[in-house]
Amino acid sequence: MTNKTTNIQATGKYVRLSTAKTRRVLNQIKGKKYQEAILILEFMTYKPCKIIKKILESAGNNALNLKYEKQNLIIKQAFANDGPKLKRFQPRAQGRAFRIQKPTCHITINLSIN
């Protein structure tokens, strides 16, 4: 007898957020039910919450396309990996320039059926 688990995934790439700050929010929703995670993200005040909520809703809609109900979904995995850094220069005194690196990250959320 094979126990086949369905993997539903949504990814946000090149998101203009810090990986560390994004992971702080993702750790709060790992292992939670879909509806509970949406509520948590709505009431948290961190910047990544809005984007993570959009990615989570996208994963939920992917589940609907596969004929699964959102009430039965659990967040199996949620992780953020480093993306490329945007390099900018800021003018400083005496003709110098300081390099500013603006981080990006790739956010992936995997859902499974309860």
UniProtKB/Swiss-Prot annotation:
Keyword Ribonucleoprotein: yes
Highest taxon of the lineage: Eukaryota
UniProt keywords, alphabetically: Chloroplast, Plastid, Ribonucleoprotein, Ribosomal protein, RNA-binding, rRNA-binding
Gene Ontology CC: chloroplast; large ribosomal subunit
Biological process, per Gene Ontology: translation
One matching Pfam family: Ribosomal_L22
Subcellular location: Plastid, Chloroplast
Any one GO molecular-function label of the UniProt entry: rRNA binding
Quaternary structure annotation from Swiss-Prot or TrEMBL: Part of the 50S ribosomal subunit.
Cited function: This protein binds specifically to 23S rRNA. The globular domain of the protein is located near the polypeptide exit tunnel on the outside of the subunit, while an extended beta-hairpin is found that lines the wall of the exit tunnel in the center of the 70S ribosome.
Protein family (similarity comment): Belongs to the universal ribosomal protein uL22 family.
Protein name, as recorded: Large ribosomal subunit protein uL22c
Organism field: Gracilaria tenuistipitata var. liui
Underlying gene: rpl22
